[in-house]
């Protein structure tokens, strides 16, 4: 199980070191994809495929299924964790989500989320405001 919040920095080569507690629970390859919010998600292969099936099963319209498949598959890359526990995040994913050097890595049970530090702080503030 993946859990916790970790603050990390991407290096100049767009590599991000995953916390040891989290990377020890993941095995290569892993899947990096755009989340449904302003984040990136990291999945194991089995959990990623299961999640896609669940999303697609909730949709009855064939066009909507194709549209969701396009979004998911075209924004997903298979990556590996190197010997130092780093992943390389493709530039197009960083750019499309405006992810900055400073990030939060969130463990959310079966996946990780990577958020720009500023965006996550703003998102968290909005959530707390909505629930107070």
Swiss-Prot record:
GO annotation, biological process: negative regulation of DNA-templated transcription initiation
InterPro entries listed in its UniProt record: MraZ, MraZ_C, MraZ_dom, MraZ_N, MraZ_sf, SpoVT-AbrB_dom, SpoVT-AbrB_sf
Taxonomic superkingdom: Bacteria
Location(s), subcellular: Cytoplasm, Nucleoid
Keywords: Cytoplasm, DNA-binding, Repeat, Transcription, Transcription regulation
An example Gene Ontology molecular-function term: transcription cis-regulatory region binding
SpoVT-AbrB domain span: 5-47, 76-119
Pfam families: MraZ
GO cellular component entries: cytoplasm; nucleoid
Assembly notes: Forms oligomers.
Protein name, per record: Transcriptional regulator MraZ
Organism: Mycoplasma capricolum subsp. capricolum (strain California kid / ATCC 27343 / NCTC 10154)
